[in-house]
Amino acid sequence: MPAIIAHPGMPLWIDLATTDITAARNFYGQLLDWEFEELDGENSGYVVARREGMPVAGLAQVPEGSLSMWGLCLYTPDVVSSHDAAVSAGATSALEPRSLGERGAMAMLLDPAGAAIGLKCPADEHALLAAGEPSTPVWYELLVGDKWEETLEFYHELAGWDIRQASNDPEFRYAVGELEGGGLAGMWDTSAMEQSTSLWTTYMGVADIDKAVSQIPALGGVVVRPPYEAEFGRVATIQDSTGAILNLCEVAEYDPAQDDVHEPDLFAPEG
């Protein structure tokens, strides 16, 4: 599995806040073939999920009665300055910048629409991520329940994204955040829906979506929406065994013999 070099503003890391970390490990270990590493010291209780040795996601326990959910962090080389700039651009600080020891530094914000978004700077010299392959994130989508224009402008200011309006139909407004012409995330105006909400969602790659979805009930999860054809492939929506919502997207296995470039790879250095 190739490592991708992240550039400022790119999605860098996903975390699962879960009410049952043991159940979550069993669910994703079987579904995505993840291995798990338990950290100690100041990060005791935090679990890193890996695929073929590459870090893919983090898992953290939250109290019973909390909502299990996936969260997204964007890469920044300076968490403090990015946090302060985000607040000036209309965000609300949910977690002040702090050191995570060997995990680097991070902060959490609520964007103008109310969706949680993290900022992260790894402790390593280079920001590397696993993405675009089975068992790794392949796409991110923001549901915007309020303040559509303000939210688009916010991510342009915070992450440096060029915002491309893919559809400006009043009944379906959709935009894509891009860097150097490569799409990083979608943004969907959900304000007209009866139960509109604002949150970031993740699409996880799987090699065979029908096989993956068929496993969900036996693993204690729920198939929220069975596989269907979308613009970028076959996708499905599931709920894991602790209640967290996740999208699945069918993608090809990495083949180094092929000249296959996934969207995040567009920012890797040439040579």
Where do the model's predicted regions map?
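Conserved short beta-strand elements that form part of the metal-binding/catalytic scaffold
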Residues: D33-S68, D111-A123, D162-T197, S241, ...
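Vicinal oxygen chelate
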Residues: D20-T22, R50-P55, L72-A113, E180, ...
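Core segments of cupin and vicinal oxygen chelate
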Residues: A3-M54, S88, E96-G104, L142-G183, ...
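A short, local hydrophobic-aromatic micro-motif
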Residues: L12, A57, W70, L95, ...
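Intrinsically disordered, low-complexity, positively biased terminal segments
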Residues: W148, D162, A166-Q195, Y203-M204, ...
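N-terminal beta-strand motif that seeds the catalytic metal site of vicinal oxygen chelate
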Residues: M1-T22, W70-L72, K120-L152, L158, ...
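Short, well-ordered, mixed-charge alpha-helical segments that flank or form enzyme active sites
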Residues: E102-G104, A116, H126-L128
